[in-house]
Amino acid sequence: ISIGYLLVKHSQTDQEPMCPVGMNKLWSGYSLLYFEGQEKAHNQDLGLAGSCLARFSTMPFLYCNPGDVCYYASRNDKSYWLSTTAPLPMMPVAEEDIRPYISRCSVCEAPAVAIAVHSQDVSIPHCPAGWRSLWIGYSFLMHTAAGDEGGGQSLVSPGSCLEDFRATPFIECNGARGTCHYYANKYSFWLTTIPEQSFQGTPSADTLKAGLIRTHISRCQVCMKNL
């Protein structure tokens, strides 16, 4: 059944993801998280087709002024992309060395709208009655980077349910230099687990190291209504 709804899948690897069974692939591309220009961020919802650009560039946009003059790759604007599990580079990467670090994506034609459901627990939430599962993941909330700019995901969007958790799920690319790197000023924010009591007043401060982090990250499931 093809009705024209769009579903976006991000592989978080350098391989194009497959569309769910019965869905046609409309195009594939690279997983764009957000742009930064004039020190202001413009976010992309990872659940919408605009987050899957068919072609990759460290600087996929230019800017124009009121004097009818436009400039490309001439200042410190940036682009941010979902990344892969490739080993962290010691230095910024350029040219073809960038490719292994950029997540691939596919835009699929779906028969119904897909939603994300979050458990706020380490258990996988159930889809509503009459809905089926498309994938399970971790509840991705928001992100910040250079200049405290960033963005976030609507928690009903499939883009808020990433199949793979990592503390640094995206990479920064500098348009003028044509390089990409994981810088120390990038932060990711995730829904956390909440005790079974549905109302929590004062949380207890905690610091989580590798190996324990996933025990405090909310799980999610992307669901689609059965037709």
UniProtKB/Swiss-Prot annotation:
* Keyword vocabulary terms for this entry: Basement membrane, Collagen, Disulfide bond, Extracellular matrix, Hydroxylation, Repeat, Secreted
Q: What SUPFAM superfamilies has UniProt attached to this entry?
A: C-type lectin-like (SSF56436)
Name the source's superkingdom. Answer: Eukaryota
Q: From the UniProt record, which GO molecular function terms apply?
A: extracellular matrix structural constituent
Q: Give its localization.
A: Secreted, Extracellular space, Extracellular matrix, Basement membrane
PTM characteristics: Prolines at the third position of the tripeptide repeating unit (G-X-Y) are hydroxylated in some or all of the chains. Type IV collagens contain numerous cysteine residues which are involved in inter- and intramolecular disulfide bonding. 12 of these, located in the NC1 domain, are conserved in all known type IV collagens.
Per the record, GO CC terms? basement membrane; collagen trimer; extracellular region
Regarding domains, what does the record say? Alpha chains of type IV collagen have a non-collagenous domain (NC1) at their C-terminus, frequent interruptions of the G-X-Y repeats in the long central triple-helical domain (which may cause flexibility in the triple helix), and a short N-terminal triple-helical 7S domain.
What family does the Swiss-Prot or TrEMBL record give for this protein?
Belongs to the type IV collagen family.
Tell me what this protein is called: Collagen alpha-2(IV) chain
Give the originating organism. Bos taurus
Q: What gene is it encoded by?
A: COL4A2
